UniProtKB/Swiss-Prot annotation:
Gene Ontology CC annotations of this record: cytosol; endosome; nucleus; retromer complex
Gene that encodes the chain: vps26
Species of the source: Schizosaccharomyces pombe (strain 972 / ATCC 24843) (Fission yeast)
Subunit structure as annotated in this protein's UniProt entry: Component of the retromer complex which consists of vps29, vps6, vps35, vps5 and vps17. Component of a retromer subcomplex consisting of vps29, vps26 and vps35.
Entry's Gene Ontology BP terms: intracellular protein transport; retrograde transport, endosome to Golgi
Tree of life domain: Eukaryota
InterPro entries to which the protein is assigned, alphabetical: Arrestin-like_C (IPR014752), Vps26-related (IPR028934)
Protein's UniProt name: Vacuolar protein sorting-associated protein 26
Function: Plays a role in vesicular protein sorting. Required for the endosome-to-Golgi retrieval of the vacuolar protein sorting receptor pep1/vps10. Component of the membrane-associated retromer complex which is essential in endosome-to-Golgi retrograde transport. The vps29-vps26-vps35 subcomplex may be involved in cargo selection.
Regions annotated as coiled coil: none
Keywords: Protein transport, Transport
Protein family according to the UniProt entry: Belongs to the VPS26 family.
Amino acid sequence: MDYFFKSPIDVDLHLDNEEERTFVDYEFEQGRKDKAPIYESDETVKGTVMIRLKDGRKLDHDGVKIEFIGQIENTYDKGNIHEFTRSVQELASPGEMRHAQMFEFEFKHVDKPYESYIGKNVKLRYICRVTVSRKMKDVIREKDLWVYRFENEPETNSLIRMDVGIDECLHIEFEYSKNKYHLKDVIIGKIYFILVRIKVQRMEVSIIRRETIGTSPNQYSNSETITRFQIMDGNPNRGETIPLRMFLNGYALTPTFRDVNKKFSVRYYLSLILVDEDQRRYFKQSEITLWRRRDEHE
């Protein structure tokens, strides 16, 4: 019975200059890894589709088309897929195919309004999909693209200054040099101990990624610690200042995404954590904005 359902053709989808592009490795599903060529947001997507017949047989088909699709998928709800862009090109009208054929396609400056993203519970994908329509089962081939969106240097970039305090026990001031960082940037700051009347065991700074899906009241958030950096071990002295320097390059970071197509957001936070000798934790979080600079693609 399997013979009757095997595809009578091989379909090869090739993107122009694919071999010369930089690829992104990603985990498409748990345990299933893949890679995709990087495209810029305003770049034309073009290539070829090669259809080869098997065993010298002919192919009766109801048309051949290629689609460029941008979609958002909630991974905890497999059926919840939202398309935010779609372009279609007809490659062949219904008819008969007796030999191998190659078709060219071009989606000129096709709309790519968001950056590609695969998170814990949401995926934003761009797909080229070829469909050979038949009276029996359609033959479909897909290829993912990975889209980067580059930004200019922010016009404003404010100093972050906050404090952590417990009445008559602890007072700490800390500051970071700015609140917006490109993905290869360095976080520079300092922590100043004004009052210390508890036994401090250690102090850490963490980068937290918070992924939020949906809108209130049907909203779901997931937080993960990207990295944890211990900046102090042992009890500090009053008046002591501890410098902070964290290099972002090398961590799996994305730009900040805010309300993408009203479906999800991805935000980043710097979390200062202080642990005393009784393992009590005192912490303060501050949101930072991450953005992609053009030279990060080079």
